[in-house]
């Protein structure tokens, strides 16, 4: 019997020989270039306008942050030389490291930092919370500025240094003054990070290139997550966009590329047999799959219809579609990342119990589903989203819903999901994505559990749940971790009722890279500093 897995593996093996025949770079030049197959096509460059990880990952090479989280989730100085905090906890004074410069040669100033924080805070989940307690920003001089708060906010430095989208990247003031709801121009991708973006070589759908900034001065501390010294060991970082998994596997086997960010689980056995390839899991919190509803338009503006669909969804189906039959590569998940202090099983029988399709059909009818079209926008160029979308599409058909399956690429999904129009005017009803486990570890950075509707900084889908917002606010001022965990239990119960999204499970995808590539850092995403190649 020819299974999907066998067919893909055979296809990858068949394409190895042609890949080997292509000309190779000279050894010296090859050592200075890191060639990566990223998880998606890079179509959007503004990491404040979008939460897309592909944009965030590239942005970390270009822009830097005032603080960076280490592997213990502690904020460490990055662009900041240090900070002071007043005794009442309401005045932060941040001092920049001397000599920081943007890639255009201009110095990094306090004015750049203040403008960047303001733009970021308009879009980011925890940034929005910080903005509500900020009294004023005050520039003292080019290297020092103050953040004066109305009340203490213990997560201030965490917010400025977290790697979760949206990241508080520091941009030149003129760029940071861009409307938060508009994208910056490609020519304004200018940061102070270890690499410069090569706009003239950017070919969406094929190639994105960054080159080492010779003027960048890394911190002295060892690199740890997104903190410490960001040492650029390559003259060029090349992202090769290869949507076809078999072709990507063949390129890795032949040495045409050095690193494949999200190898297809069906091809793990093939890759493991190659002694020149290493598969290694670098993200201990894994990833969380989700199905996102558009709650502005029928049919999923109706919570009963959302609940009817969720009652038929089986996390095992989604996880096996992503990682195959190896049960060690996935776990059932609720609304907070399994294994973290805020996670619990409260209410999760609604997601884990037996699935009854006939009961779900009856629930849809009782909820008033009138055969409205359901537009599922599916990114087929990313296996993680494609697999989930296929499971949902089959489920919708079995439930008798009027499915319009729009197979497209991730770049198009990123653009289309921003539309608030009804489906007849180019809108959408459903899409799948995933979040790094870190991003769902607590309410602070958890953008998809927000219930702020179409308010400032709301995320695509625009669910409205006043109770979720009340509980989130309470979490920030809770007196202890135990009290916070209790709040998260209630948040999970409310989320199961209101369903801002449906979690499809927690999964673990290793990086696949050539054995001569070393120094890849553990973290919630691929980090391109500290890496070397022999």
Where are these regions (language model features)?
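Long beta-strand-rich cores associated with HINT superfamily self-processing modules
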Residues: 513-534
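Periplasmic-binding protein-like
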Residues: 270, 296, 300-340, 387-388, ...
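N-terminal lobe/hinge region of extracytoplasmic solute-binding protein
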Residues: 37-87, 118, 190
């Amino acid at each position: 019997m020819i299974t999907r897995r066998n067919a893909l593996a055979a296809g990858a093996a068949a394409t190895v020989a042609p890949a080997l025949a292509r000309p190779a770079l000279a050894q010296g030049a090859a050592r200075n270039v890191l060639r990566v197959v990223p998880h998606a096509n890079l179509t959007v460059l503004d990491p404040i306008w979008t939460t897309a990880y592909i944009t965030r990952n590239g942005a970390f090479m270009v822009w830097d942050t005032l603080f960076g989280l280490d592997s213990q989730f502690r904020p460490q100085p990055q662009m900041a030389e240090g900070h002071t905090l007043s005794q009442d906890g309401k005045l932060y004074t941040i001092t920049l490291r001397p000599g920081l410069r943007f890639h255009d040669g201009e110095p990094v100033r306090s004015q750049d930092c203040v403008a960047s924080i303001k733009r970021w805070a308009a879009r980011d989940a925890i940034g929005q919370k910080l903005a509500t307690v900020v009294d004023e920003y005050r520039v003292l001089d080019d290297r020092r500025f103050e953040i004066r708060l109305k009340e203490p906010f213990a997560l201030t430095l965490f917010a400025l240094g977290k790697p979760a989208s949206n990241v508080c990247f520091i941009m030149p003031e003129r760029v940071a003054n861009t409307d938060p709801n508009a994208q910056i121009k490609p020519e304004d991708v200018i940061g102070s990070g270890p690499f410069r973006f090569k706009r003239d070589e950017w070919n969406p759908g094929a190639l994105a290139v960054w080159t080492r900034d010779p003027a960048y001065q890394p911190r002295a501390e060892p690199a740890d997550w997104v903190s410490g010294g960001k040492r650029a060991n390559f003259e060029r970082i090349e992202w090769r966009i290869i949507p076809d998994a078999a072709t990507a596997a063949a390129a890795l086997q032949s040495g045409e590329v050095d690193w494949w960010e999200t190898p297809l689980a069906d091809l793990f056995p093939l890759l493991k047999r190659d002694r020149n390839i290493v598969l290694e899991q670098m993200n201990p919190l894994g990833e969380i799959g989700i199905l996102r509803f558009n709650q502005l338009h029928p049919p999923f503006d109706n919570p009963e219809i959302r609940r009817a669909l969720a009652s038929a969804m089986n996390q095992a189906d989604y996880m096996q579609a992503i990682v195959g039959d190896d049960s060690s590569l996935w776990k059932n998940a609720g609304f907070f990342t399994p294994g973290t202090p805020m996670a619990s099983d409260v209410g999760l029988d609604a997601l884990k119990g037996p699935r009854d399709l006939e009961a779900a059909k009856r629930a849809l009818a009782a909820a008033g589903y009138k055969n409205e079209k359901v537009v599922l926008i599916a990114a087929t160029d990313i296996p993680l989203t494609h697999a989930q979308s296929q499971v949902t599409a089959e489920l919708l058909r079995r439930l008798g819903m009027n499915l319009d399956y729009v197979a497209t690429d991730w770049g198009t999904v990123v653009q289309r999901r921003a539309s608030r129009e009804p489906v007849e005017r180019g809108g959408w009803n459903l899409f799948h994505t995933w979040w790094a486990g870190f991003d769902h570890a607590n309410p602070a950075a958890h953008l998809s559990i927000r219930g702020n509707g179409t308010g400032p900084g709301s995320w695509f889908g625009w669910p409205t749940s006043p109770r979720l917002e009340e509980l989130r606010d309470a979490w920030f001022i809770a007196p202890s971790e135990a009290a916070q965990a209790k709040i998260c239990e209630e948040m999970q119960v409310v989320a199961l009722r209101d369903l801002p999204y449906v979690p499809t499970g927690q999964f673990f995808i290793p990086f696949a890279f050539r054995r001569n590539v070393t120094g890849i850092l553990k973290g919630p995403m691929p980090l391109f500093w500290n890496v070397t190649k022999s």
